[in-house]
Amino acid sequence: MSESEARAAQRAVEVLSAYGVSHVFGVPGAKIDSIYDALVDSGPQLVVCRHEQNAVFMAAAVGRLTGTPGAVVVTSGPGTSNTATGLLTANTEQDPVVALCGAVPRADRLKRSHQSMDATAALKAFTKYTGEVNDAGNVPEAVANALRAALTQPRGAAAVILPSDVLATPVSAGITRACPVPRLGPAPAEGIEQAARLIRDARRPVILAGVRGADPEACAALRTLLEDTDLPVVETFQAAGVVSRTLDEHYLGRVGLFRNQPGDIVISHADVLVTVGFDAVEYDPKLWNTDPSRTVVHIDVVPANIDNHYQPAIELQGDVASTVRALAGQLSGLRLDPEVLGELAEQRRALKDADDTARTANHTRAGLNPVSVLLTLRDMIDDDATVTCDVGSHYIYTARHFRAYEPRHLLFSDGQQTLGVALPWAMAACLVRPGKQVVSVSGDGGFLFSAQELETATRLGLHFTHVILRDNTYDMVRFQEELKYGRTSGVQLGDYDIAQYAGAFGAHGYRVETEEQFAKVLGEALSREARVQPGITIIDVPVDYTRNTELFAQLHEGVLE
């Protein structure tokens, strides 16, 4: 190998560095060990995980939190197939992530040999870009194009399949600088003017902020619009935090899953609905837009996904931030009718009343009130804390009651509702937001989907708190089965000693029985200097979910129409 040459594996690492990738997550193996070897000398920080699925969760969270793709490096066969759920979750929820997957040597590709599989065919269904490289000289460009695909809107997951003999081959060509994805300009001026007229002429205009509206620049532009208008905003789960604390009077709650929130009432009464970066996967339009003739203004970087219940009158396709800024210039000083402002104030009171009612609802000896626990957590954390939420009944309560004031600081799996994401996401948040409070929340079922990564977290010296709301069932399934069939099946789980489990990995584990105990342990765990409780704290909180069928309650049409 000449001085100008390097193994293709080294060239792949150089591309990751050129594109600003900060962390590589994975589990090593013989078919990908050349990249692990290259990472010894240079490149992103390597984080060795306990399972490839969790490695993808961590990388995807880095992508969501920073806007720069996270990277995963895994071996062939099961190492690659184990990434499927993580890649599917990232792709659906538009988190930029790239997986570099080892493969058997090219000569064994079509043989029935150890760990041979058609990885490209397997992963294409879960990614927006997947390709196998058969020439070592093409490795740098393949990795670069995967990174660009992950960053192109709608963002998502990409994978590159790399046979081990290709990675070991010396090549001279490399890519040492990033080629950024071109940024679009604002939507056409005439469309913006038309949209501004519709909004100005409307009696009850409403903004529905979605996942791409929570991108930092888009969020800043939306806040500029709100500062000089009376426009109300309803957030999707993925847009949590778009409305800042100083703009709280514009906030009308979050919507998703079940059509029964104050935000649903506000949306149903809107004569012009302005969607900003909204994706149908966040909240199926058939659930909330029962009158498709209602005027919808679609602001997004991608075209609308037309269906029977979502047919925008105007599509403003372009850079969301630039488009919203241009629209703000034409809506400056927009004021709503006092009667409409009164209606909105009534729904804001309903939001507060819902918090108060849920917080004080009776609970049994079986456990604590889950909403009260979550609101205690909200009261005790900083506004710049990162809270990651797993999937389960607590996920619905969190989305409805837990306020966030900065985007990408309250994280949900809203597209696939994937169990086990919260703990790996929290670990990623610790890596990219050092010194900030990080809390993850899960049920006792979801916790065990990724709990083995506690070893990874303690090995890395991370500091965060994980709250487990435990009822020993798959409760989100349980209460829906009760509503459908009047009985349950397959949802009962056994108890386990969470405190001992945590201690086995070097974490601090506690089981609390009262809200006072919870607040005390949480306060010690959140100590910014980590003097009281350094490292990782796992808090086991028994909760009473007997009122969960109320989550599914439907508002009657007289309220909604």
Summary of predicted features, one role per range:
Residues D108-Q115, R245, F258, D307-H309, ...:
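Thiamine diphosphate
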Residues S2-R335, T376, M380-D383, H463-H466, ...:
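N-terminal alpha/beta PP-like core and its mobile active-site loop of ThDP/TPP-dependent enzymes
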Residues A9-A12, Y19, A30, I35-V40, ...:
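Active-site diphosphate/adenylate-binding microenvironment
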Residues S2-E3, I175, P292-S293, V297-Y395, ...:
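Phosphate/pyrophosphate-binding active-site segments
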Residues E282-P285, S293, L327-L336, V340-D355, ...:
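Hydrophobic, well-ordered secondary-structure segments
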Residues L208, T388, S442:
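Short hydrophobic beta-strand that contains or immediately precedes a catalytic carboxylate
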